[in-house]
């Protein structure tokens, strides 16, 4: 039955290990997915940052082109004002020319009048020819000046209008391209922000799942440790019960042998075959263990046939995971053990008191910050009896022996002075 239960606990332990390993693999997969998502999110964030920089650059270009367009419009307005000014100048020049023409006509009229008063035909013909020549020269010069001014004005205005139209067309094209590019980047930025929101949602969901799995893993670990502790406690209890039964059986067998030996002795005494020379020594040890989990007792009976009998009993108890497993009767060492499988026990500044026959008392104090590992033992040697090898072996430099006696009490106290474990040895001698 014990073997079946042990197999059942082992099976549960293996299943718990497999479940623990499966949870570990799931967590590793989730961590890989989380890393990939974080990398993708970082990539999208960099792309969004680049697009935002591109949008900012295009906005700057657009602002530059708008400023250039405003400058062109201002130049157009200025050129329009200049055109009006030049037209006014042309009008002024035309008026001056007209005024000069009227003045010249008046001078011509005066000259004609003077010529009319001149009765000489030759003089009249001469002045007439001179006047006609002067009029032709003035008209030719006037026509030439008007044509030159008109041609220059038309060429200049055509050139300016063409430049303004070309610049306006180019700016309109660039502004349209910039608007299309901004629209495209806005659409792309909106898509990337949507993807980023989806990925952040998935990331949050995966983090939540990973947190739940971590909680579940912690619960499984606690359940697993509790199951292990229960199994260890049951196994320890079963072993103690088996040991108690074995000790009881051994004690019965030893009692039977003792009775058989006493019967044989009495039979020989009745037959008159007593022979006290060369007595044989009969040594029997009976070990009996009591208590469910904390208290243990051991008895040793030493019989000297026909003379003396020596009886030694040991009693152990512990209030916690640290117990006194052994205290040598010759005073060489004391052995402590941490019976827990996974919990460390800080026993720094704890004290071991050993009282010999109710008189002499020996006290050993553990070093500060000393920790007894799970399932480990520590042996404290008296001076000169063992080797100093922490944390498994310590040496009590103050005494070369923990003392020897018939009634020896070894008690472990914590820093608060509370008793945590004890080991009691009692010896008695009888004469037969």
From Swiss-Prot:
GO terms for molecular function: structural constituent of cytoskeleton. One of its GO terms (biological process) is heterochromatin formation. Residues 1-277 form the IF rod domain. Residues 278-432 are annotated as: Tail. Residues 112-128 are annotated as: Linker 12. InterPro entries: IF_conserved, IF_rod_dom, Lamin_tail_dom, Lamin_tail_dom_sf. Residues 310-427 form the LTD domain. Residues 1-111 are annotated as: Coil 1B. Keywords: Coiled coil, Intermediate filament. GO terms for cellular component: intermediate filament; nuclear envelope; nuclear lamina. Residues 129-277 are annotated as: Coil 2. The keyword Coiled coil applies. Belongs to the intermediate filament family. This is Muscle cell intermediate filament protein OV71. It comes from Onchocerca volvulus. The gene is OV71.
């Amino acid at each position: 039955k014990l073997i079946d239960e042990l197999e059942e606990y082992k099976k549960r332990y293996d299943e718990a290990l497999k479940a623990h390993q499966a949870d570990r693999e799931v967590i590793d997969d989730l961590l890989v997915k989380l890393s990939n998502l974080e990398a993708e999110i970082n990539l999208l964030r960099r792309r969004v940052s680049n697009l935002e920089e591109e949008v900012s650059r295009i906005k700057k270009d657009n602002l530059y082109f708008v400023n250039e367009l405003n400058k062109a419009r201002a130049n157009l307005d200025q050129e329009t004002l200049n055109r009006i000014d030049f037209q006014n100048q042309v009008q002024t020049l035309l008026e001056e020319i007209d005024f000069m023409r009227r003045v010249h006509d008046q001078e011509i009229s005066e000259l004609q009048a003077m010529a009319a008063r001149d009765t000489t035909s030759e003089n009249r013909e001469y002045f007439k020819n001179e006047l006609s020549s002067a009029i032709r020269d003035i008209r030719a010069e006037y026509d030439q000046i008007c044509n030159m001014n008109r041609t220059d004005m038309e060429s200049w205005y055509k050139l300016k209008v063409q430049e303004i139209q070309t610049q306006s067309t180019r700016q309109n094209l660039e502004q349209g391209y910039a608007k299309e590019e901004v629209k495209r980047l806005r659409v792309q930025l909106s898509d990337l922000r949507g993807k980023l929101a989806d990925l952040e949602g998935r990331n949050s969901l995966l983090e939540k799942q990973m947190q739940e799995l971590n909680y579940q893993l912690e619960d499984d670990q606690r359940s697993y440790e509790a199951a292990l502790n229960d199994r260890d406690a049951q196994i320890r209890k079963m072993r103690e019960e088996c040991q108690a039964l074995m000790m009881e059986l051994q004690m019965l067998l030893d009692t039977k042998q003792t009775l058989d030996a006493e019967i044989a002795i009495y039979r020989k005494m009745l037959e008159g075959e007593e022979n006290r020379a060369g007595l044989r020594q009969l040594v029997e040890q009976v070990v009996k263990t009591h208590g469910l989990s904390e208290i243990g007792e051991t008895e040793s009976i030493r019989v000297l046939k026909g003379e003396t009998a020596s009886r030694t009993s040991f009693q152990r108890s512990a209030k916690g995971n640290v117990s006194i497993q052994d205290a040598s009767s010759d005073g060489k060492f004391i052995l402590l053990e941490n019976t827990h499988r996974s919990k460390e026990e800080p026993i720094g500044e704890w004290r071991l008191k050993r009282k010999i026959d109710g008189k002499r008392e020996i006290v050993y104090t553990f070093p500060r910050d000393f920790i007894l590992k799970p399932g480990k033992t520590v042996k404290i040697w008296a001076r000169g009896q063992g080797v100093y090898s922490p944390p498994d072996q310590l040496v009590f430099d103050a005494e070369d022996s923990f003392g020897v006696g018939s009634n020896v009490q070894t008690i472990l106290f914590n820093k608060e002075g509370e008793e945590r474990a004890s080991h009691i040895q009692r010896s008695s001698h009888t004469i037969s």
